[in-house]
């Protein structure tokens, strides 16, 4: 068995990780995580979501990483680089997902460390994200020194259909040069 390796997914390597990303989304949603999909998510929908990422990756507006072990995707994270002329200093952290069976191994922290380092290289000194209020993810982001701004009530539905608030976080990495 190989050790888990962090890899950047490019337009060229996308096909190699497509199935693993779809499986990760499927298992994450069916594990109860609120990442934009409902409990009736099937693999066809998961593949469609994956396929929608490729154009943004090719355009350079979305950066995507996976942690893979023996070519199995265990975790992933995305960084959406704001393309607005007045927002070139910021980016949104999206879809940090870790397989339920791979949690507790530090993969989320490994991904977030990489996301932050690359954000600085892209001169994105302000990162923001949202996560389900009251979820275990809140403690995770707080431990990484993200600042909680507040909540939006009834912002999204959990996979089982209940409306739930989302918590908004940010982190300042430094001033772009």
UniProtKB/Swiss-Prot annotation:
Q: Does the keyword Membrane apply?
A: no
EC number(s) for this protein? 2.3.1.-
Looking at the record's lineage, which domain of life comes first?
Bacteria
N-acetyltransferase domain segment(s): 4-174
Which residues of the sequence carry a binding annotation for acetyl-CoA? Answer: 27, 96-98, 104-109, 130-131, 141
Does Disulfide bond count among this protein's keywords?
no
Briefly, what is this protein's role? Renders tabtoxin-producing pathogens tolerant to their own phytotoxins.
User: Which named protein is this?
Assistant: Acetyltransferase
Q: What is the originating organism of this protein?
A: Pseudomonas amygdali pv. tabaci
Q: What is the lineage of its organism?
A: Bacteria, Pseudomonadati, Pseudomonadota, Gammaproteobacteria, Pseudomonadales
């Amino acid at each position: 068995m190989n050790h888990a390796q962090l890899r950047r997914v490019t337009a060229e390597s996308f096909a190699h990780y497509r199935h693993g990303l779809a499986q990760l989304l499927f298992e994450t949603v069916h594990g109860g995580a609120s990442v934009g999909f409902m409990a009736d998510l099937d693999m066809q929908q998961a593949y469609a979501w994956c396929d929608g990422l490729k154009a943004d990756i090719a355009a350079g507006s979305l950066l995507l990483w996976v942690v893979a072990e023996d070519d199995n995707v265990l975790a992933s994270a995305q960084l959406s680089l704001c393309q607005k002329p007045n927002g070139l200093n910021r980016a949104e952290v999206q879809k940090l997902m870790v397989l339920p069976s791979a949690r507790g191994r530090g993969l989320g922290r490994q991904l977030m460390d990489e996301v932050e380092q690359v954000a600085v290289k892209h001169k994105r000194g302000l990162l923001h994200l949202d996560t389900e209020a009251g979820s275990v993810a809140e403690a995770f982001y707080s431990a990484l020194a993200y600042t909680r701004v507040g909540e939006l009530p009834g912002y999204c539905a959990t996979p089982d259909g209940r409306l739930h608030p989302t918590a908004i976080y940010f982190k300042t990495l430094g001033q772009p040069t």
